[in-house]
């Protein structure tokens, strides 16, 4: 795979936006330089090869970001694929510059056990075009009563939430907070 050189782009670096050239090799930024093509008339949609056989794209008047993260998406698969699928949602995310999406657990089956979560994870492995990280449910079936098995789910989920439903019992919520903290996980409690 050839290196990609993005020239004259605006990059957030060392706490401020500045014009820089980036060289990317195998998906990683390997070099940052001052702009090399100032005043270039190369179109950003017409890449060319330079003397180092790098693919070069002029990014004048463009901002370069490594990728955005969406912490709250509804790729409603499994169970509600008539609304959205992991494939369609992740393709839309990629089109908008998102490289990571975290999926809410209001699915069927609810990812409240490792077995249920594995249904979703299999689809993610097969269909996602960006990194898709699932949330686990705080309670079984998102019913607000019995806690899901956090210890079992924690290695495979980004965090825990009963998205849009909530956990009304104060004691149950406290128990969830203690378990999440012990496992180094977050509880997502706000739905906007």
Residue ranges, per PLM feature:
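Short amphipathic alpha-helices and their capping/turn segments at secondary-structure boundaries
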Residues: 59-60, 90, 173-187
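Divalent metal-dependent hydrolysis catalytic cores, especially in the metallo-beta-lactamase
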Residues: 87-111, 128-140, 154-168, 184-188
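Active-site metal-binding motif and surrounding structural segment of the metallo-beta-lactamase
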Residues: 43-64
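Metal-associated gating/positioning segment near the N- to mid-region
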Residues: 62-124
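Distinct, well-ordered alpha-helical segments
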Residues: 113-117, 143-151
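Active-site-adjacent beta->alpha loops and helix N-cap segments on the catalytic face
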Residues: 111-115, 167-179
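Conserved small/polar residues in nucleotide/adenosyl-binding loops
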Residues: 191-192
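N-terminal metal-binding scaffold of metallo-dependent hydrolase/deaminase domains
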Residues: 1-48
